């Protein structure tokens, strides 16, 4: 008997979202995006790394904030998802009303934050100490929110005050409260997970979280969590400020694209090295192999 095909209700750069009545099913594909563009390559096992890594962190941090994960076992999902292509990379989730802010936290100065700091000594309106070098650890993690871009557009960094206004427009009377909670949850999550990662030989330089509201108006952690797609992971062994660091994430692919003037198809060698980095990070952090 054939199984009725289900079409996604939303396709993001990397994920597909399926309607499942009161819940959603989020499938992490093997697509890869850089600079807000979906590349032509498929990176085998990448979707499984993203889903299983998120599960690991969601389980670890539910004492700080509830999250949207219900199950990553396809047996808990409709029959359509009990195909091999969905096994390991699919997550049954609670429905949330997602808040329109990307919650970025930076523990080290790198990437776009470093570029802005070199110009004016600040990041997203936050004054930082003088004389920092690239990849330096910051005295305290900083919260630097951004807007959420549509596919093909770029996210825009905003100040904390702008995030209050942005949320107030969507949720009158709640802007300040929500903005403060997003900031506090983001920093608490980062601190707990960065401390843990360091014991496994990985520096989490920065990451982003996304949050939504449940049916009772409570803030819940959604989307993905501390994956190589949403974070910069550096090997702690050999960490040396003053320049960019080797990494366990898609920085490897980004660097190749920068050097090759946005040719949106990676050579197979770069694809293979990218998934090797993802798998290494997963194994170091979780102690498990995929």
Language-model-detected regions and their locations in the chain:
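Active-site loop/lid in soluble adenylation, ligation, and acyl-transfer enzymes
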Residues: 1-150, 262-290
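A long amphipathic alpha-helix within ATP-dependent nucleotide-binding catalytic cores
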Residues: 171-205
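Anionic ligand-binding catalytic core segments
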Residues: 119-122, 127-177, 221, 225-285
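Conserved metal-phosphate-binding beta-hairpin within the catalytic cores
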Residues: 105, 204-225
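Surface-exposed helix-capping loop/turn segments at secondary-structure junctions
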Residues: 63-68, 192-204, 217, 286-290
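Intrinsically disordered, low-complexity acidic/polar segments
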Residues: 35, 114-115, 216, 230-232
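Coil-to-beta-strand transition motifs
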Residues: 23, 98-100, 200-204, 216-219
């Amino acid at each position: 008997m054939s199984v009725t095909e289900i079409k996604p209700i939303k396709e993001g750069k990397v994920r597909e979202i399926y309607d499942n009545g009161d819940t959603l099913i989020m499938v992490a594909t093997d697509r890869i995006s850089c600079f807000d563009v979906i590349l032509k390559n498929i990176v085998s096992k990448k979707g499984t790394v993203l889903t299983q890594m998120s599960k690991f962190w969601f389980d670890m941090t539910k004492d700080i904030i509830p999250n949207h994960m219900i199950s990553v076992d396809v047996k808990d999902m409709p029959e359509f998802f009990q195909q091999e292509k969905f096994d390991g990379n699919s997550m049954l989730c609670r429905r949330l009303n997602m808040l329109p802010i990307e919650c970025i936290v930076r523990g080290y100065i790198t990437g776009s934050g470093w570029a802005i700091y070199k110009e004016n000594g600040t990041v997203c309106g936050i004054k930082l100490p003088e004389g920092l070098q690239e990849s330096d650890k910051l005295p305290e993690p900083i919260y630097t929110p951004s807007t959420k871009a549509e596919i093909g557009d770029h996210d825009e960094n905003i100040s904390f005050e702008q995030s209050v206004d942005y949320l107030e427009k969507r949720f009158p009377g709640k802007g300040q409260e929500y903005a403060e909670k997003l900031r506090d949850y983001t920093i608490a999550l980062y601190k707990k997970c960065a401390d843990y990662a360091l014991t496994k030989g990985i520096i989490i330089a920065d990451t982003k979280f996304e949050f939504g509201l449940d049916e009772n108006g409570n803030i819940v952690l959604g989307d993905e969590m501390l994956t190589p797609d949403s974070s910069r992971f550096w090997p702690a062994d050999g960490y040396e400020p003053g320049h960019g660091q080797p990494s366990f994430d898609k920085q490897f692919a980004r660097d190749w694209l920068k050097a090759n003037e946005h040719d949106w198809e990676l050579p197979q060698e770069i694809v293979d090295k990218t998934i090797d980095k993802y798998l290494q990070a997963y194994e170091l952090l979780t102690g498990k192999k995929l």
